[in-house]
Amino acid sequence: MSYITQRAAEAVYSDEGRRQLKENINCYLGNAKKITDGLESINIRCFGGRNSPYIWFEVPNGLTSWQMFDRLLNTVQVVGTPGSGFGTIGEGYFRLTAFAGPKRTLEAVERIKNGLI
């Protein structure tokens, strides 16, 4: 293992590393809450986001997960993952992540809400 990798691993376990890690996790979980709150405000059933930065929602209006991908990308310029990418059981669902900053997350939520209403 390279020296740089060893030092990076060591830094994670320092007080500063722990502080930064906790800050990042709290940011991502806060973003996930913003996403779930936004989806639920327009009666979209969603799952996840409480213990991870991934949020799944049921694709509305009988669309396939790929149709939802196309709609979000081309209409509101938001990218996510079609559920069918996880196998046939994922069809009918769509996955979003909370790996953006708070401002970009709120912007994406508003775009999604406007694109799905």
Give the residues covered by each predicted segment.
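PLP-dependent class I/II
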Residues: M1-I117
